[in-house]
Amino acid sequence: MIIEPRMRGFICLTSHPKGCEQNIKNQIEYIKSKGLIDGAKKVLIIGASTGFGLSSRITSAFGSDAATIGVFFEKPPLEGRPGSPGWYNSAAFENEAHKAGLYAKSINGDAFSNEVKKQTLDLIKSDLGQVDLVIYSLASPVRLHPVTGVLHRSVLKPIGHSYSNKTVDFHTGIVSEITIEPCNDEDIVNTVAVMGGEDWGMWMDELKKANLLAPGATTVAYSYIGPSLTEAVYRKGTIGRAKDHLEATAFAITDSLTSIQGKAYVSVNKALVTQASSAIPVIPLYISLLYKIMKEEGVHEGCIEQIQRLFQEKLYTGEAIPTDEKGRIRIDDLEMRADIQEKVAQLWSQATTETLPEIGDLAGYKQDFLNLFGFEFEGVDYNADTNEVVNIESIA
C-alpha cells in the first residue's frame, strides 16, 4: 500500500515501515561513526521501541556489541493497516542486529504486568544468564496495577492553581493562550502510579530475586527537569511529582543492590520531540525556540546523540559516574546552559503566530515529529508501494 501521514490532533495514525527502517539505519551509522564504547555486554531495555529506550538499545548493540532484550507494547500491522512505529523500529533493529551477528530478542506486551516480567526473566535465564545493564524508559499514559488491579491514568496538570501561558499548534503554526486547570489529589496519585518509580523498583526486585543481575550491574531510568518557563505544567505539576518519585526510587534500588555492588541512576535528558512531549501544552513552543538556538550554537542533539554521549562520557569512562547534588546524571547540561535559557526566555516574550517562523524552528519540530512515524526521511521513496506487514524476527 501507499502509506501517507494521517493526523488526528497530536497523533499520527499511520507509520511507514521503510522510513522507520531508515531511522534505525541512520542511528546505527551515527553510533558506528563515534567509535566503540567499553559498555555493558548484556542489556535489558524496558521500553525499547521508540525514543531514548530505542536509542539505548542501538547504542548498546552497535557501540558495545551487546546482546539486547527489548520489552515494549506495540501494535503489529495487519493487511491494509500499518503497525505502530515502535513495531517497525524493533523489526528493523532486530534485522540489522542479526545481520551484524548480534543477539537481539524482543517481547511485545504490557511491561507493567507480572506476565511480561515473568516472560522476560525466563528469556534472560535461558539465553543470557544475567544482565549487566537495565534501561528503564517507559512512556505509557496508563498502568493496570499488577497487584491491586486498579487502572491508573496519568494527567498533565498544574498543582494548586490554574496556569496560563502561550502554546503552539505545531501543525498550523498558530500561537495562542492556553489555560490549564489544576489537578485534584487523585490526579497526583494516579500520575505517580503510572510515571513514578514503583514499576522500575518491581522490575529490579524481580531481577535480583531471580539472580539475573550480574555483579556491579547498573540500571538507568530517564527523567526531565526543564526550565522555569515550563515548570508549572511540568516539573512543579503532576508529572513532576512522578519524576520526584522516580528519582527517589533510584536511591531505594541502589540500597537493595548493595550485595551485588549494583547502582541505580536517573539520567536527566534534554527536551526532545516525542509523541508524549507533543501532547503537553506549552512544551512544543518551548522546544521550537530551544531547537533554533541550540542549532545556531551548534549544540543541538537528538535522541541518539544524547544517549551516545550518556554512554560514552558518563556511564562508561572507567571513572566514577558524575552526578549532581541530588545524585542525578545530567545530559540536559547543554539545554540548561544559562546563555541558552536566557535567549529562549527573550524569544518566548516575542513569540506570536507571525514571528514564530522567523524566531523559532517549527519546521525542525514538524520534521522531527514526522520522523517519529517514519516519514520525511531522505532516501525513502514514499510514492512506492510498500508492504505494511512486517514481522519482528524473534516474535514472528
Question: Can you name each region flagged by the protein language model?
Answer:
Residues G35-F73, P77:
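Canonical Rossmann dinucleotide-binding motif of NAD(H)/NADP(H)-dependent dehydrogenases/reductases
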Residues I2-K25, H98-K99, L229-A396:
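NAD(P)H-dependent oxidoreductase Rossmann-fold/reductase module
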Residues G47-L54, F112-N114, A139-R143, I225-L229:
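Gly/Ser/Thr-rich loops at beta-strand to alpha-helix junctions
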Residues D65-K105, D110:
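Glycine-rich phosphate-binding loop and adjoining beta1-alpha1-beta2 segment
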Residues R153-G262, V268-Y291:
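Catalytic loop of short-chain dehydrogenase/reductase
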Residues I46, V131-A139, L151, T218-S223:
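Rossmann-fold scaffold of SDR-type NAD(P)-dependent oxidoreductases
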Residues N108-T120:
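The beta1-alpha1 cofactor-binding region of Rossmann-like NAD(H)/NADP(H)-dependent oxidoreductases
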Residues Q119-T148:
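A glycine-rich helix->loop->beta "capping" turn
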